[in-house]
């Protein structure tokens, strides 16, 4: 069965995401370097890729280019502690599905589950979208991460 591929050099961070996703019934493959990630993709194309922007042996942005050369539709989430404004436009241009702040782990977990479910059910996801935040409390709901998100997202 295809897996969610998590690529991050933080073992603790990867372990937490992996346990959450496995508990939800999704198989997970982890890699701490781009070399390991390339080997995992050679073995089997994943359901979803979630890749850190900065890895010991290269950039998640460059790995995005490699993945897009092989598969234009595969959901690819770039996750980083950096300010998204610094890399989001470039990631969008290169074909990233979503850019996420690693510190919003609960939201990232939910997005990974959403994209994995869409892949398994054959639903098409938008090629790129931003998470929208609504200033009017009338259209908001409290998120598990402590912020507000627009209803219906």
List where the protein language model places each region.
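Two-component/phosphorelay signaling modules centered on CheY-like receiver
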Residues: 11-29
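Conserved acidic carboxylate
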Residues: 8
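Short amphipathic alpha-helix used as the core "switch/output" element in two-component signaling
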Residues: 39, 61-73
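Active-site beta3 strand of CheY-like receiver
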Residues: 44-50, 55
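CheY-like receiver
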Residues: 111, 120-153
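Alpha4 helix (beta4-alpha4-beta5 surface) of REC/receiver domains from two-component response regulators
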Residues: 62, 82-110
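Acidic catalytic/metal-coordinating carboxylates
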Residues: 32-33, 59-62
């Amino acid at each position: 069965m295809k897996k969610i591929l998590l690529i991050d050099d933080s073992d603790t961070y990867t372990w937490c995401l992996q346990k959450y996703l496995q508990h939800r019934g999704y198989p997970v493959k982890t890699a701490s370097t781009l070399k390991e990630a390339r080997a995992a993709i050679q073995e089997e194309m994943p359901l979803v890729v979630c890749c850190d922007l900065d890895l010991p042996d290269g950039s998640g942005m460059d790995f995005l280019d490699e993945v897009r050369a092989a598969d234009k539709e595969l959901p690819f989430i770039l996750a980083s502690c950096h300010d998204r404004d610094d890399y989001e436009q470039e990631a969008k241009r290169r074909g990233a599905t979503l850019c996420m702040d690693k510190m919003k782990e609960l939201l990232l977990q939910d997005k990974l589950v959403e994209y994995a479910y869409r892949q398994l059910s054959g639903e098409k996801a938008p090629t790129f979208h931003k998470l929208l935040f609504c200033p009017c409390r009338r259209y908001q709901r409290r998120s598990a991460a402590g912020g507000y998100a627009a209803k219906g997202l």
